[in-house]
Amino acid sequence: MRALLALEDGRIFEGESFGATGTRVGEVCFNTSMTGYQEVLTDPSYRGQIVAMTYPLIGNYGTNATDQESTQPHVRGFIIEELSKIPSNWRAEESLDDYLRRWEIPGAQGIDTRALTRHLRTRGAMKACLTTEITSPDEAVQRASAGEGVIGMDYVREVTTPNIFQWDPDDQLSRKWSLQSGDQVLPPIRHRIVAFDYGMKRNILRSLRQRGFGVTVVPATTTAAEVLALNPDGVFLSNGPGDPKALPYAHETVRGLMGRKPIFGICLGHQVLGFAFGGRTFKLKFGHRGGNQPVKDLRSGKVAITAQNHGFAVDPDSLPKEVEVTHVNLNDGTVEGMRHKELPIFSVQYHPEAAPGPHDASYFFEQFAELIANSS
């Protein structure tokens, strides 16, 4: 079956449908990861977006329940060059085609993803319509233009937990996956923290528990007073989807916690912290999405290759003098990390937990533990 990808600027790509049929509209973006497509599909940060993978062959190892970063996929559509129709992995439970069909997510293969990526890199991320139903390219372009983008959108309310809960109280979900037999012993809980769920990935929760954190997950709309009533040792701000400017309730809450608890934010949490500091964000031309983004630590001069997924960045000129930019992206010079010079608060724009991606930045979880220990 024919699949049509129409961009709001009139560019048309034709391919073959896989997964579900139907019509979906959202911002189209590209991810440069070679593997980890299931983690990409189930990352809540992709809520409202159509994702194109730049690696040419996708679906090689199928899908399984263990590697999901949330309970369900969040992308609106999935664009690839070639689908591997016969997955080959002993852990595979379902093909990518069947998985997307079960979750009613349309996909398109046979798309020239290199040409699509070059177009988005030149023109910028934009709204798109992915359809197996609309036969007229002009109509599909009109649907794309009339659809919602990401700017001004609060998708966090769609993906946050509705209730407060304790992550993995029985220590059954946080052990590292390994081929080796025998149980892996998790460290004792040294610090109890509250984690704001703006769209949090499971591997963040696993990474925190593996470093000795006991984690209470709270909805994104939880107030500062409600958090303080839990009396945590620290506060974690998670990743998530949408426009950080559209979350005034989160800005207010974090502002109310500053100076009262140590705070560590990543991705959207980093951007929310930027607003809480009194700063602002701006939309990147095409975002940073993939596992090969070079980031420089301005204090040590060291460079790490990082996993990233964001379309906005903190404006360094908007930050007050009490806030120091600590990390920058070597590709475009944008802010990748910051800290408060006087308060126990720091954040990074990227994903130290990876999943998928390199583990160069996993040490930030240990730094958070040290920050809490030194602040108590």
Predicted features and spans:
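Active-site-proximal beta-strand elements of phosphoester/diester hydrolases
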Residues: 192-197, 306-307, 346-350
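Proline-centered loop/turn at the N-terminus of a beta-strand
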Residues: 106, 192, 262-264, 280, ...
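Residue-level structural signal for beta-strand termini and adjacent loop
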Residues: 17-18, 56, 309, 340, ...
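Cysteine-nucleophile active-site neighborhood
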Residues: 234, 239-308, 313, 357-367, ...
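A glycine-centered loop/beta-turn motif at secondary-structure junctions
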Residues: 337-375
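Residue-level detector of beta-strand face positions
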Residues: 4-5, 43, 294-296, 327, ...
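Catalytic beta-strand/loop cores that center a nucleophilic Ser/Cys/Thr
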Residues: 301-343, 376
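RNA-binding accessory domains that recognize and position tRNA/RNA substrates
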Residues: 1-225, 229-230, 244, 355-357, ...
